[in-house]
Amino acid sequence: VEAAWQAGKITLSYFQSGVEVDAKADQSPVTIADREAEIKLRELIRLHYPNDGIEGEEFGREEGTSGYSWLLDPIDGTKSFVQGVPLYGVLLAREGAEGVDVGCVYLPALNEMVWAGRGEGCWWNGRRAKVSETEKIEDACICFTSWMNFAASQRDAVWQGITKKARLVRGWGDCYGHILVATGRADASFDPAMNPWDCGPLLP
């Protein structure tokens, strides 16, 4: 939680500042805020968990010896960040032999911190979080990142079937949509294209 908060402070110092945007090899955007935030996350993990591995979006993988590895996404939703939209987040999770046991998402521009641990429950800004009790898709609020991702992954027909039935469909995307689900403000969030550092922090 502390690491996510510190990395989030770095991102806020660049948010809505006209920060320069570079293109990675896959043409996805990256900024100095992404890089500096991941450097801070790695620094704090090495300080407190020196034997753990680290895998981050911007600087790749460092092997460890403890059997645990940290998954880092310094800015999930860089396109939103660059656009000045506050729905981006700092993501981190710890993964071991039995899967992810701790995950944290911090939304710096909204000052929302959500974390969960195996056997510890889920917490949202210091209070217990729980999912909604909606049972029928006809009553559900559905979130998504981009409808184009469904077409690109040949799941467009599935997506169309879901959205035609749902009560409300909104493009509150990236990690924000999933946090809305975790805190009971939305009922489901769909994203067919995710990396380990995108989905790992959401699993606990």
Predicted regions and their residues:
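An extended, acidic
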Residues: 130-204
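Residue-level signal for inorganic ion chemistry
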Residues: 11, 34, 45, 78, ...
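Short, solvent-exposed loop/turn motifs
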Residues: 100, 128-130
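N-terminal subdomain of lithium-sensitive/metallo-dependent phosphomonoesterases centered on the IMPase/IPPase/PAP
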Residues: 1-75
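Generic detector of well-ordered alpha-helical packing
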Residues: 35, 39, 58, 74-77, ...
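DPxDG-like acidic metal-binding loop motif
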Residues: 64-123
